[in-house]
Swiss-Prot record:
SUPFAM superfamilies tied to this protein: L domain-like
Organism of provenance: Homo sapiens (Human)
Domain of life: Eukaryota
Protein name: Centrosomal protein of 72 kDa
GO cellular-component term (any): centriolar satellite
Any single Pfam family the record assigns to this protein: LRR_9
Skewed-composition ranges (Basic and acidic residues): 152-161, 220-234, 366-377, 390-402
InterPro entries: CEP72-like, Leu-rich_rpt, Leu-rich_rpt_typical-subtyp, LRR_dom_sf, U2A'_phosphoprotein32A_C
Family: Belongs to the CEP72 family.
GO MF: identical protein binding
Length: 647
């Protein structure tokens, strides 16, 4: 590769010298420029020398030592660029050609970037859409398609990985999506604690109501439940995540709730809550009396939410009390345990002893969660079981909630009075409507009144939720308004600073303009003075040179007279020569006439000689014919005479 020697920046004077343009011609007229490197001088930087070459279409900078292409972006009309045997080593310098959209032919051969960058050719093809030839090789359609696919995939990956901070700040964050993202980032693979829970269930033979061996059941149950509560965040299904995240107005509350999900589940033996289930409606099928696994609930599952949701507390009444669609995910949120893990009570044990359930320490929300979880898991109860479940649900709902000391102080008196009145109304309704013989599912009067109570509760909770959401929105808007005001103040300060700078610069520009005007006036005055001086000097020169011009005219006339005299002499000589030629012509004419007469005489003599010769020839022909006739008369005599001589 060409070595980069001492720094040599191309200058506009060198461009003019190489192109042959005069100092007063515009560089924009130049269309072709060739500045190849030599052994003495090799250009390393372009500088701002090409700024005025806006009409240049062909540029040859081969065999130089260019390490940077800064300054080439001014050649917007360039079509051919030759950078053969330079020192361009990175794609960042090649990227400076992106402004030259008219490039058709580019040559980067013997540059380090060709050998160092594996995607160099695809990069250049993608960078220049009109490129037809690269490094003395034509650009094929397959290469253009490959470059488009290659760099389009990289752009999509970069856009996914690097989102601008302004977009991240300006984009609204939905709390449910935020909660889902936070849970999705956590591992879903079982760790040692999950394996311990599964081993405990296996040792109990899938019945947590039976202690595994000689180990204390209560101690192991607490350990397993504690581990399960700590690890349940990793086992949440997407549907459960959506239910737990809640609506967009409760983002802060749900964030604090997720931090409290590590609380331990309290194991409560069912024998303390109720006794044996008395048989109803005679003997039940074996399948309905089969024991089911127990469920354990926390004493106060929602106590952690009361400090930030006191204005939006609502009684969690299960949607299964009345026929109809399930409540919205935002309203089902409080019927789930904070840790998101459910276990199932035995149907017979869970439906027994409603009187003891009424006075137990199990909160109404836990029983409500149990019923909602059983309905979501698809369990179908028989008519007696449904009746008892309805009774248990009703009595569980009427239980007075015992919040923690921290949350008890946060509950407003109006909400407590409303809850007490609602519970009292439900108790009276259950006492009036249910006699223990029939299911409340078929009691239309009870269902109508229960629906009325539930609708009033839902309206109240909806109003509370909307007020809380509006309050939170107002707070967020106030914070946003403060931030916008502070930003506006900063922008105003910055604008004021910029305006002061611009004003100062404008004042300085006006001052410079005044100076330039004064200088222009002085220059115009000096120009007019010089013009008047030039006119006066011309007049003086004309008056002083009059005599000299006359003398010059006389000398010129004299020389012309002499020249004419010489011409006259020459003409006289030519005339004498003409006379001599005329005499010679007459002599030649006379000799010609004599020659003609001699020629005629000779022609006459020749004709006479020809006639005589013709007569002689005819005489010879006649003599020859006579001789032949004579010889023809004596052939035999001559032959016999010849034979005798032979004998």
């Amino acid at each position: 590769m060409a070595r980069a020697g001492p720094r040599l920046v191309l200058s506009e004077e060198a461009v003019r010298a190489k192109s042959g343009l005069g100092p007063h011609r515009d560089l924009a007229e130049l269309q072709s420029l060739s500045i190849p490197g030599t052994y003495q001088e090799k250009i390393t930087h372009l500088g701002h020398s090409l700024m005025s070459l806006t009409g240049l279409k062909s540029l040859d900078l081969s065999r130089n030592s260019l390490v940077s292409l800064e300054g080439i972006q001014y050649l917007t009309a360039l079509e051919s660029l030759n950078l053969y045997y330079n020192c361009i080593s990175s794609l960042a310098e090649v990227f400076r050609l992106h402004a030259l959209t008219e490039l058709v032919d580019v040559d980067f051969r013997l540059n380090p970037v060709v050998k160092v960058e594996p995607d160099y050719r695809l990069f250049v093809v993608h960078l220049l859409p009109k490129l037809q030839q690269l490094d003395d090789r034509p650009v094929r359609a397959s290469e253009r398609k490959a470059s488009r696919l290659h760099f389009a995939s990289e752009d999509s990956l970069d856009s996914k990985e690097s989102v601008p901070a302004s977009l991240k700040e300006g984009r609204p964050h939905h709390p449910r999506a935020k909660c889902t993202e936070a849970l999705a980032k956590q591992s879903l693979v079982m760790d040692a604690d999950d394996e311990a829970v599964l081993n405990l269930i296996a040792e109990c033979e899938w019945d947590l109501g039976r202690p595994p061996g000689s180990t204390s059941f209560s101690q192991k149950g607490r350990e397993a439940d504690s581990r399960g509560s700590q690890e349940s965040r990793h086992l949440l299904s997407p549907q459960l995540v959506q239910y737990q995240c809640g609506d967009s107005g409760k983002q802060g509350r749900e964030t604090r709730r997720s931090s409290c999900r590590g609380c331990c589940l309290e194991k409560m033996p069912w024998s303390q809550l109720c006794g044996e289930l008395p048989p109803l409606y005679g003997a039940e099928p074996e399948a309905s009396r089969a024991p089911r696994p127990h469920t354990y609930f926390t004493p106060h599952p929602d106590s952690m939410d009361t400090e930030d949701s006191a204005s939006s507390q609502k009684l969690d009444l299960s949607g299964e009390m009345v026929p109809g669609p399930l409540p919205a995910p935002g309203k089902c949120r409080k019927r789930r345990m904070p840790v998101g893990r459910f276990q199932t009570f035995s149907d017979q044990e869970g439906l027994g002893c409603p009187e003891r359930t009424h006075g137990s320490s199990v909160p109404k929300e836990s029983l409500s969660r149990q019923d909602s979880s059983e309905s979501r898991n698809g369990r179908t109860l028989s008519q007696p079981e449904a009746s008892e479940t309805e009774e248990q649900r009703s009595r569980g709902v009427t239980d007075t909630r015992e919040p923690s000391p921290g949350s008890h102080s946060a509950l407003p008196g109006k909400k407590t009075a409303l809850q007490a009145a609602l519970l009292e109304t439900l108790l009276d309704l259950v006492d009036r409507s249910w006699g223990g013989c029939r299911s409340l599912h078929s009691n239309e009067a009870f269902l109508a009144q229960a629906r009325h109570i539930l609708s009033s509760v839902e309206e109240f909770t909806a109003a509370q939720d909307s007020s809380a959401m509006v309050g939170e929105d107002v707070g967020s808007l106030a914070l946003e308004s403060k931030s916008l005001q502070s930003r506006l103040a900063e922008q105003q300060q910055q604008h004021a600073r910029e305006m002061s700078e611009v004003t100062a610069e404008l004042h300085h520009t006006h001052k410079e303009l005044d100076d330039l005007r004064q200088h222009l006036d002085k220059s115009l005055e000096e120009n007019s003075r010089l013009k008047s001086l030039l006119l006066s000097m011309k007049k003086e020169v004309k008056s002083a040179d009059t005599a000299a011009t006359l003398n010059l005219q006389i000398a010129g006339l004299q020389t012309s007279v002499k020249r004419l005299c010489g011409e006259i002499v020459e003409l006289k000589q030519h005339l004498e020569h003409y006379d001599k030629i005329q005499e010679l012509t007459q002599m030649l004419q006379e000799s010609h006439s004599s020659l003609v007469s001699t020629n005629e005489h000779l022609l006459q003599e020749l004709s006479q000689v020809r006639a005589q010769h013709r007569a002689e020839v005819e005489q010879m022909h006649w003599s020859y014919q006579e001789l032949k006739k004579t010889m023809a008369l004596f052939p035999h005599s001559s032959a016999s005479h010849g034979g005798c001589q032979a004998c």
